[in-house]
Amino acid sequence: MKPRIPLITIALCGLAVTMCTKPQSNHRSISVSIAPLQYITEQIADSDFRINVLVPSGASPETYEPSPAQMQQVAKSQFYIHTGLIDFERNLEQAIRNNMPDVQQINVSEGVELIAGDCGHNHQNNSEKLAHDHEDSTTHGHTHAQGVDPHIWNSPRAVKQIAATIYEALARQYPDSIRYKNNYHRFISRLDSLDSELTALFGPNTRHAFIIYHPALTYLARDYGLQQIALENEGKEPSAEHMRRIIDTARNLNLTKLFYQRQFSKSTVDALARELKIPAVPIDPLAPDVINNTLEISKLIAQP
């Protein structure tokens, strides 16, 4: 994973010039790192804020780097909401702390029961828990550098904690807003309904396993007893040996579910689909609507 600090530094240089020549307004605007966080924030804040999403649609957070224009958007924001678990987020988190003291950062991974994993997030239903002490935010940033699966927005149980963190930050800033509280509780009710639906969908006595190129469904797999088998190996294209193990596992388990994300190369997926004679199905774990998207993906996994 190539370093991104130099480009952020360049962006900050341009930002410094802009901030010296234009009046700044850091109110009624929120910047978020990825689209799912935009959706979650909107469910609570409604239309009170203009929300800027840094990673554009169709791009991969793994390779994204913020532009100078986006850094200017962040500087004008009242809040910057992120998971703190993706490389560019950590670099940007430090840059904001050093150069944009008026921007309030909301790290939504706080309180979430995290799962161990490297930048490739290669898990086969790995549910190893992590001690998640956020009292030292600097240590927290370094701890996550090579050790935590970041895809916390793909399970409603984790999203409940994400929503709570966002709501609490808004409530501290706007303690008289009853609407944020009501919106938050409505959203939690929807997440509880989704949780119940997924629990019934997967059931306690049914085994559900699937192959996926980039293992973005680790939290969903943990929370609902699924087996996720990743093609990616430590964030890289799988070796011939790794592919052979996956083929053997798929045949032994009679697997028929193969998912891929359009943000990643499809050549390996196509080769595996031909070998196993099963279809390769596109999904988008970064789609904004975390409720409907998680339900749609879950229904694909649960199909006989």
What are these regions (language model features)?
Residues 1-8:
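Bacterial N-terminal signal peptides that target proteins for export
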Residues 8-16:
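Bacterial N-terminal signal peptides
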Residues 19-304:
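Extracytoplasmic metal-acquisition and chelation regions
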